[in-house]
């Protein structure tokens, strides 16, 4: 009985000392408890990570395979979409724009370098066009001058005729015998002219008949 009583006293004394130590150093006890809890949490986290790593290894392989296959499927779908879009794409309507010769030559010089033959050909065409334009202008000026001269000459001839007509003396009472003699002379000239014309016609008809008779 005395031994039990002594052991109980020792237990109570150790408990009192521990409680007094706890009261004297509360911060140390709190830090120790925090360290123990952190260690327990870290151990639990490591175990969880190991478990998840073991469980997720096949899934990761599947996901990598799916990620490897996904670009190929996307490329194939893009190719099919692009081919369909190329087939179904409407053709643009052609637009014909008019440009001046100078602008066209500048654009072609900027876009592509010309050869010496092309330059010579262009210069030749320019020269020919210039010569044609000059000839055309000269022809127009010449036609204008000729028309002007014709008008002037017609006007001058008409004026001269009018002057000559005004200078004619048609008064027969001044010298009637002389006027009558001139009239007879003009009449004889007309008769002789008519006779010459008739003789020429008769001679032609006789020659025609003679040729026709020889042909028979």
Swiss-Prot record:
One of its GO terms (cellular component) is spliceosomal complex. Residues 63-85 have a biased composition (Acidic residues). Keywords: mRNA processing, mRNA splicing, Nucleus, Ribonucleoprotein, RNA-binding, Spliceosome. It comes from the Eukaryota. One of its GO terms (molecular function) is RNA binding. Residues 28-41 have a biased composition (Polar residues). Residues 1-93, 172-216 are annotated as: Disordered. It is found in: Nucleus. GO terms for biological process: mRNA processing; RNA splicing. Residues 177-190, 201-216 have a biased composition (Basic and acidic residues). Component of the 25S U4/U6.U5 tri-snRNP particle, a subcomplex of the spliceosome. Interacts with PRP38. Component of the spliceosome and rRNA processing machinery. In association with the spliceosomal U4/U6.U5 tri-snRNP particle, required for splicing of pre-mRNA. Belongs to the SPP381 family. This is Pre-mRNA-splicing factor SPP381. It comes from Saccharomyces cerevisiae (strain YJM789) (Baker's yeast). The gene is SPP381.
């Amino acid at each position: 009985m005395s031994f039990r009583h002594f052991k109980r006293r020792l237990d109570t004394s150790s408990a009192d000392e521990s409680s007094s130590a706890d009261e004297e150093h509360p911060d140390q006890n709190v830090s120790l408890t925090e360290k123990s809890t952190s260690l327990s949490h870290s151990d639990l986290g490591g175990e969880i990570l190991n478990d998840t790593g073991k469980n997720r290894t096949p899934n990761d392989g599947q996901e990598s395979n799916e990620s490897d296959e996904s670009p190929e499927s996307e490329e194939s779908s893009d190719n099919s979409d692009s081919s369909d879009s190329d087939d179904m794409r409407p053709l643009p309507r052609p637009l014909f724009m008019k440009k001046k010769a100078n602008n066209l030559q500048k654009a072609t010089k900027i876009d592509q370098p010309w050869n010496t033959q092309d330059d010579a050909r262009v210069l030749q065409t320019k020269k020919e066009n210039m010569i044609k334009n000059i000839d055309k202008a000269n022809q127009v000026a010449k036609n204008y001058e000729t028309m002007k001269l014709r008008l002037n000459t017609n006007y001058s001839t008409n004026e001269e005729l009018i002057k000559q007509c005004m200078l004619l003396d048609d008064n027969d009472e001044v010298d009637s015998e002389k006027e009558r003699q001139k009239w007879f002379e003009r009449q004889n000239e007309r008769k002789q002219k008519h006779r010459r014309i008739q003789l020429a016609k008769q001679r032609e008809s006789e020659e025609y008949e003679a040729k026709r008779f020889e042909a028979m």
